[in-house]
Design a protein with these regions (language model features):
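Short glycine/serine- and small hydrophobic-enriched flexible loop segments
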Residues: 1, 51-61, 119-126, 184-188, ...
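Second-shell loop/turn segments in exported
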Residues: 1, 39-43, 57, 61-64, ...
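N-terminal carbohydrate-binding/catalytic regions of secreted carbohydrate-active enzymes
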Residues: 1-49, 252, 256-259
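Residues in the short coil linking paired helices within alpha-helical repeat scaffolds
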Residues: 4, 65-68
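Amphipathic alpha-helical interaction segments
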Residues: 6, 19-22, 63, 86, ...
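Active-site-adjacent structural elements in enzyme catalytic domains
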Residues: 10-17, 57-58, 70-78
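Generic hydrophobic/packing signal
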Residues: 19, 31, 50, 56-63, ...
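Extended ligand-binding clefts on enzyme/binding-domain cores
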Residues: 46-47, 67-246, 251-261
Length: 269
């Protein structure tokens, strides 16, 4: 929130007028300023929906803004109705309304483990009470503990749960840019599982304590992630696991690319 209601309202105005265009109360995921119309894919992305609802709830509570709280509750209802599903005895968060379940995906349901924004789920339960939220939290965490692909024992960005969990067809079988944020979401939610943190940190780390995207089949690094916004994720995990202080090099914020900049800000918050 940055304690800046005026800037938050500008972001919310853009979100409301440019992204909340679907009939189900969820946000379109792809907006391109270089083309007209700007929306190039009308499907939603459930991590984005969770983050929007979560931000609105925090802002509404912090600034006593009933409109934000009502919008947050409305979005939480839509998430629960359209994105939280039951399959194979689990409660799951599908990545989007279209394209991740049978009959369109015969190997569905498909999940993206990094879409579980664990810190947001209890807030959703306050907005729209349902025992399904707790089950979503618990089953997501149990899945993360069980998803150990390849020699580095890492989760895949995209996972098929039609039978035994496996990397989903049609996607790179990798611990990729999506999954890099998983340890950060876990730490921000206050989840205490040092064994899980250690496995993720060891699996995603290459030379010089640098995180990387990983080819799951071979265990070999694909892209080394030198930006401070990526490196800080490993540093946060080290702080949680062994009490190591964050290095000064990652405590200085100098934004570069959008995604690692957001990871760094969330790590420093």
């Amino acid at each position: 929130l940055a304690n800046n209601p005026a800037d938050f309202e500008q972001i919310w105005y853009f979100t409301r007028t440019e992204l909340l265009l679907r009939d189900d109360g969820l946000a379109v995921w792809k907006w391109d300023p270089a083309v007209t119309p700007h929306v190039t894919d009308t499907n939603n992305a459930s991590d984005g929906d969770l983050l929007i609802a979560y931000a609105l709830a925090l802002a509404g509570s912090a600034w006593n803004n009933k409109d934000y709280l009502q919008a947050a509750a409305s979005m939480a209802r839509s998430i629960l109705a359209h994105l939280v599903i039951s399959s194979g005895g689990r409660t799951l968060l599908i990545p989007g309304v279209e394209g991740y379940r049978p009959p369109g995906r015969k190997d569905g349901p498909i999940i993206n483990p990094s879409y579980w924004v664990f810190e947001a789920i209890p807030v959703m339960a306050l907005l729209v009470p349902s025992d399904r939220w707790q089950k979503l939290h618990d089953d997501g965490l149990a899945l993360l503990r069980s998803l150990q692909f390849g020699p580095r024992k890492l989760p895949a960005d995209w996972v098929s749960l039609t039978a035994k969990p496996e990397p989903a067809g049609g996607f790179e079988a990798e611990f990729g840019y999506n999954s890099v944020r998983i340890p950060l979401y876990l730490t921000r939610a206050g989840i205490d599982d040092k064994a899980l943190f250690s496995r993720l940190q060891q699996g995603m780390t290459v030379e010089d304590d640098e995180p990387a995207t990983i080819d799951l089949a071979t265990g070999k690094p694909k892209d080394r992630l030198a930006d401070p916004g990526y490196r800080i994720v490993n540093d946060v995990v080290a702080c949680v696991v062994s009490g190591t202080k964050l290095p000064a090099s990652v405590r200085q914020f100098a934004p570069s690319l959008y995604y690692p900049a957001t990871l760094q800000l969330l790590s420093l918050a």
